[in-house]
Every structure is written in structure tokens, then in C-alpha cells.
């Protein structure tokens, strides 16, 4: 299984927002979105990754990009993680049925968590760029996302 | 403003802060003053007589006082005391609130009023941001990150 490729329409999926409302492919329409799939809330690398992206969030906004964090943690765990870090990046939960959205995007790791991966979706719902880290311990730099935004 | 796409590591320039021994090819270290791993690296570089250039990489959600500390170091630099402030900041990472910064400035004999105005100035903020953004563009993701002869050396503390 590998991450959904550029040029393909985003798959149908259902994630849960922090208030448990549904978040689907329709919520990606009309703007450029970057889904940041990360393995585990509170783990060290995921912490560094979200902290780094948060630091340059205004620069992503200038480029018209909205970031979302996606993991298989529960809504409550994601909320606690977000609060602990003091970040504003919206979190989306793939908790039940576990990993269904991650599987649809081709990023579900056999050990039960999302691969560390980035998926950029254009305003029409087409995957514009995707990236899968060589291992869950590798943290993709923010520069890679800016490169993809510049290549639009 | 443009994005922060990939760009080569900027070579050493006159604005870089060189620390330690005078060597031809110092390390380039991206770090912040609140980061415990950075403090370990700093202590080891000092102990081993290393030669390095220090560049700021503050990430506020990780280390809430890192930006303030970086700006304090740059404000001290405007009075010729970067190195002294740098050492004083790493000497006590637990005391980085404003009164602690003023106290350091006083102890170093700086003009505290000027120091306080400078550390909040757009110019100093831009100076810190320039380091940070150069790191982002060169692929720095966490602190400390060390470049040796232009190549990134990801450094877990145990490996330093």
C-alpha cells in the first residue's frame, strides 16, 4: 500500500472533527488542503512535526493552504494533544472504523497507525501532490510542502 | 511574502555569530535557548573546544520563550555582547522570563533600556526570522540541527 498519487481524485472518506462532526471529501472543496497523516498523538516526532508546521502556519495561509492533522487517535486524545502543544492546526480522527480513511488514502501502516505522509488536495478535490516519509521516524520538512505549493 | 521552499544552506556570512575556536570550517548549528538537547550540544561544544556558528531556530509551541531569548541575544549583539548573552542564556535555561533577561543585560553591563527596546524591535525580529527561515528552507525540522561542511548531521543527543 502506498500513498494516493497526484492526479487522482481524493477518495471518499469520513473523519471526525474535534467536535465529532463528520469531515469528508466535500469539506476539501474550494481550497487547497494539506492532510498531515501522523502516527501517534504525543509521540516525539509527531510533536516536532506539528510544532514546526504550526510555526509557519501563517506562511502556509499566505499560500492559500489549510493544514489538517490526521491520525487514528480518538477525538479526545487529539484534542488533548493539540491543547498540550498549544497549536491551532485542526485535528481529524480516523478512530472508528479504525484507519478506514487512512486505508483509502493508502497510508495505513500494518501495525495499526498512519504512515507519516502528506497529501495536498486542490480546490477541485484532486490530489495535487503526495509524499510518504521513508519511515515513521522521518519528519518531512515544511520546505517540501512549500515546494509543492509553489509548483501548482 | 513568498513561501519557504527548499533552498541551499546559506554559507557563513558576516552576520553569522561565530563561537568557539577560530577554524576554517566551523559547524553551523540551528538551535534555540530553551531546548534541553541544544543545551547539551552547547555544553559539549564548549567543553571540546569546538568551532561553530549559531543560528536561531525558535519554535514557539515547543519552547514558548525561545523567540524572546533569541531576540535577547540579538539585542545584546547590537551592543557587542552576543557571545556573552548566548553563554548567559544557556547557563540557566529555566530563567528566561523578561526580568531574567533584564537581569542578564544588567550583569553584562549593557544599556538595559536600549536592550529592552531593541529586543522588541522589528529589526531584531527580522534578524531571528531570517535564521529560522533559512533553516526551514534547508530542511531543518528540529533542534539542534548541525551542518558540517554544508551537510546536515541529524543529531540525537546521545550521538553528539
Segments and roles (model prediction):
Chain B
Residues 25-106:
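Structural alpha/beta surface segment adjacent to cysteine/selenocysteine redox centers
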Amino acid at each position: 500500500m502506498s500513498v494516493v498519487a497526484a492526479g487522482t481524485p481524493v477518495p471518499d472518506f469520513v473523519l471526525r472533527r474535534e467536535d465529532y462532526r463528520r469531515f469528508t471529501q466535500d469539506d476539501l472543496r474550494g481550497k487547497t488542503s494539506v492532510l498531515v497523516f501522523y502516527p501517534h498523538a504525543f509521540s516525539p516526532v509527531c510533536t516536532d512535526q506539528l510544532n514546526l508546521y504550526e510555526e509557519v502556519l501563517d506562511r502556509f495561509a499566505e499560500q492559500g493552504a489549510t493544514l489538517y492533522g490526521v491520525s487514528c487517535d480518538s477525538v479526545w486524545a487529539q484534542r488533548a494533544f493539540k491543547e498540550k502543544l498549544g497549536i491551532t492546526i485542526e485535528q481529524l480522527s480516523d478512530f472508528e472504523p479504525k484507519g478506514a480513511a487512512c486505508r483509502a488514502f493508502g497510508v495505513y501502516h500494518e501495525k495499526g497507525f498512519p504512515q507519516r505522509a502528506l497529501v495536498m488536495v486542490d480546490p477541485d478535490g484532486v490530489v495535487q501532490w503526495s509524499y510518504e516519509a521513508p519511515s515513521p521516524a522521518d519528519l518531512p520538512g515544511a520546505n517540501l510542502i512549500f515546494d509543492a505549493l509553489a509548483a501548482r | 511574502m513568498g513561501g519557504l521552499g527548499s533552498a541551499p544552506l546559506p554559507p557563513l556570512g558576516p552576520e553569522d555569530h561565530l563561537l568557539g575556536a577560530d577554524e576554517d570550517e566551523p559547524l553551523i548549528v540551528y538551535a534555540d535557548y530553551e531546548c534541553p538537547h541544544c543545551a547539551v550540544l552547547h555544553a559539549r561544544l564548549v567543553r571540546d573546544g569546538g568551532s561553530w556558528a549559531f543560528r536561531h531556530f525558535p519554535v514557539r509551541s515547543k519552547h514558548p520563550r525561545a523567540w524572546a531569548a533569541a531576540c535577547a541575544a540579538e539585542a545584546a549583539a547590537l551592543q557587542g555582547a552576543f557571545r556573552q548573552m548566548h553563554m548567559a542564556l544557556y547557563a540557566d535555561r529555566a530563567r528566561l522570563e523578561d526580568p531574567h533577561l533584564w537581569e542578564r543585560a544588567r550583569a553584562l553591563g549593557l544599556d538595559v533600556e536600549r536592550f529592552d527596546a531593541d529586543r522588541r524591535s522589528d529589526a531584531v525580529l527580522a534578524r531571528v526570522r531570517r535564521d529560522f527561515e533559512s533553516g526551514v528552507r534547508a530542511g531543518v525540522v528540529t533542534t539542534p540541527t548541525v551542518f558540517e561542511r554544508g551537510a546536515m548531521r541529524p543529531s540525537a543527543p546521545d550521538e553528539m
